[in-house]
Structure formats: structure tokens, C-alpha cells
Amino acid sequence: HAGQIRAAAEIRSILDDSEIAPLPKKQVQDPYSFRCVPQVHGASYDALAYCFSVWEVELNSVTDNPSVFEEESTVLSGGNFHGQPLALTLDYAAMAVAEFANISERRTYLLVGGQRGLPAYLAEKSGTDSGMMIAQYAAAALVSQNKQLCTPASVDSIVSSNGQEDHVSMGANAATKLLRVIENTLNALAIEWLTACKAMQVRSSKTGTELQKRFADFVQSHDLNHRTRPMQDLIKDSYNYCWER
């Protein structure tokens, strides 16, 4: 599985020389959302690679009607305009992208769960401070919306043109849904980054060098005080840091 190999290599690179990774473990096994990242991310990588291969073929194809063959002086009416190859893969891509958000939200949930030495909700004062609780709510809402958006558009069809166009791909609907899934997923991942940085502020041990640099850069350049700033602003800061630099 090429995607799994890629995902595992990324994790090894990120955690290289981490002070936390080699620490003694009390738990026999981690939850799937941590332990199975290479398998889940890898499957999405492979799915997206397939989708891109189909899109590349489509970009280099004749997708019009009629088809004109200049050398043969022939014009043939056909169906190359039909967008089924795009519709199916756009739906598939939405499912693949949504899985990044699905597993990310589970990790965010565990980060605020008050386990493994971290305070509940990563709150500074338990009982009077809701910490990152609302951030996890937002991630859960994004993931839930993605599930609705991943209902395939390509299984739908409606008749038009007086019955002449009696099977259509709905590829445009699949494309607009994919764009929304991508945006939701980017926000869910930004919430995980924000939550992870809040957790790192609690820890004394350092993670891998490159990740530690990014963590330090983010917390030093942004006010992460959730008690004085709206959570929306913190999430927006994280989104901009992750995706718009």
C-alpha cells in the first residue's frame, strides 16, 4: 500500500528525535485514531491518487459532441460529453478527504478527554473554564456535515430535454460538495492543530524538532487565551497558520 508507506514515513519524520515518543507507556495500545493513522491516511492517499489519474485522462480526452475527425473528414455523434468518470471520482474523493476529518476529530476528542495527564478540556481552571470543549464541538459539527455531503451525487439522475437526456452524471453537484468537504476538513484539521498546541503547553517534554519549532512559532505569534478571545478567532488563527501561510 503506497499510501500507507507514505503516511508512515511522514509520521516517523515528524516524530524523529521526539522526547515524548520513547517515554514508557502505561497503555497496552493506543486508540485506533492514533494507532491506525498510516492505514487510514494511506487509504485516502491511494484513493485520491486514483481520482487524479482519472481526472488527468479526462483532461486529455475529447469531451464534446459531436466528435470531429479532421483527417477522415468525419463527424460522429456520440456520448463523450457524459461526465460519469468525473462524477464517480469526485464522490470518491469527497469520501477520501472526509476521512482525514473523521479521524482528526477523534484525536481532538481524546485530547480534551482529560486522559494521560492532560486536564479535562485542556482547561486551566476546572469548573470555571470550558477550555477547548467548544472547539471539539465545532470539529464534530464539521465531521457530521461531511457525512451528509458525502452522500454520492453520482447515484442520482433526472430526466431533461424531453427525455433525450435521460441519464446524467450530476458531476457538478459532486464537485461543489467536494469543495465543501475540503473546506470542512481543513477547518477540522486546524482545530486539531489548535488543540494539540494547547496540550503541548501543558507538557514539559518536547516533541520532534521540526514540529516543536512550528508549535513554538504558533504559540509565540498568536494569543491562544481562550478565556479572553472568542473560540472562533482562535480557530481562524489556526486555520490561517496551517493553510494560508
PLM region spans:
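C-terminal auxiliary extensions adjacent to catalytic cores
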Residues: 1-245
